[in-house]
A protein has these predicted regions:
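Conserved ABC ATPase "signature" region
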Residues: 6-25, 76
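Helical segment within the ABC ATPase nucleotide-binding domain
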Residues: 69-81
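Conserved ABC ATPase signature
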Residues: 29-33, 37
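Conserved catalytic motifs of ABC-family nucleotide-binding domains
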Residues: 50
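Catalytic Walker B motif of ABC-type/P-loop ATPase nucleotide-binding domains
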Residues: 54-58
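Hydrophobic anchor residue at the start of the ABC signature
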Residues: 43
Length: 144
C-alpha cells in the first residue's frame, strides 16, 4: 500500500464517516458509543487501510437487532467489494445467514466445514452444537 498524504488521509476519513453514518459520534470517545456504533467504527477503521481481508470477532455480541441487521448489510456490501471477511461468533443464525462458507470448531478442532446449508443439515453438527430443532434463516440483501 502506498502511504497517503495528510490530505488523502483526511479525504478517506471523511468518506468512511459518511459511508458508515458516523457524523454524530465523530468526536465521541469509544466508551461512549453504543454496541452498533462501536461495530461500525471498528469496521470503518479496518477499511481505512484498504484491506483485502478483515476479521470480525463477535460482531453480533452485545448489539440490538437493528444493529445486527446493519452489520449484516455492511458485510454484504463488503463482499460485493471483494473484501474477504472472517467472522468468529457464537450467534449462529446471525452469522450463518450471511456466510458463503462456515467452519464449526468443537473442542478445539474443526468439526465441519461447508456452506451454511450443509452445516445446518449435518447430523453430527446438530448433535454436538446446533440441536435437532435448529432452523437456518438466510438473509437476502437485494436493496444494497
Amino acid at each position: 500500500m502506498t502511504p497517503l498524504t495528510p490530505e488523502q488521509q483526511q479525504e478517506r476519513l471523511e468518506m468512511l464517516i459518511e459511508e458508515f453514518g458516523l457524523h454524530k459520534v465523530r468526536t465521541n470517545q469509544g466508551n461512549r458509543l453504543s454496541g452498533g456504533e462501536r461495530r461500525r467504527v471498528e469496521i470503518a477503521r479496518c477499511l481505512a487501510i484498504d484491506p483485502k481481508f478483515i476479521m470480525l470477532d463477535e460482531p453480533f455480541a452485545g448489539v440490538d437487532p437493528i444493529a445486527v441487521q446493519d452489520i449484516q448489510s455492511i458485510v454484504a456490501k463488503l463482499k460485493q467489494r471483494n473484501i474477504g471477511i472472517l467472522i468468529t461468533d457464537h450467534n449462529v443464525n446471525e452469522t450463518l445467514s450471511i456466510t458463503d462458507r462456515a467452519y464449526l470448531l468443537f473442542e478445539g478442532k474443526v468439526l465441519f466445514q461447508g456452506t451454511a446449508e450443509q452445516l445446518a443439515d449435518n447430523a453430527l453438527v446438530r448433535e454436538k452444537y446446533l440441536g435437532r430443532d435448529f432452523v437456518l434463516r438466510r438473509k437476502s440483501f437485494v436493496d444494497l
